[in-house]
Every structure is written in C-alpha cells, then in structure tokens.
Amino acid sequence: MNIAFSFKNFEPSEHLKKYARRRMEKMGRFFGKASGLEINVVMTADKIRHRCEVTVTGEGLHLNASDQTNDMYAAID
C-alpha cells in the first residue's frame, strides 16, 4: 500500500502528517490484500476552511471522498 500526501496553501506540522498517515493506514486494512493499492491524499487550507480529498485506487477499485470543515483533523476523519 502506497500513501502519497500533497499539501496546498499551508505547511503541515509533523503531528498532522503522522495523524493523517495513521488514519489512512487504518482505512487501508478494510481493503484486505488488494494488490497495487494506492492512496492519494490532498489537503488544502483556505482562509476559513480546510479540505481533505482522498482517492483510493487499486486493482478493480477506484474510490474518491472529500470533506471540508474549519478543522483539518475533522476533515481527515
């Protein structure tokens, strides 16, 4: 399982990076042993909102989810 992170309009703290990685690894276990599983996470910060977009791709699998809120940790969840 490969996890790639992209950040737009802000510099993430180490704690945020670790938190996001833990959440994505936890989510990855729901896909079992899907081969070639890749998770792409894009986090964007604007003046009053934070957005997290997650794309999961694998063999015969393509999922996309996003959320926006005023707290990046809540958007990741």
What are these regions, as identified by a protein language model?
Residues 1-77:
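N-terminal, polar/charged subdomain of small-to-medium soluble alpha/beta proteins
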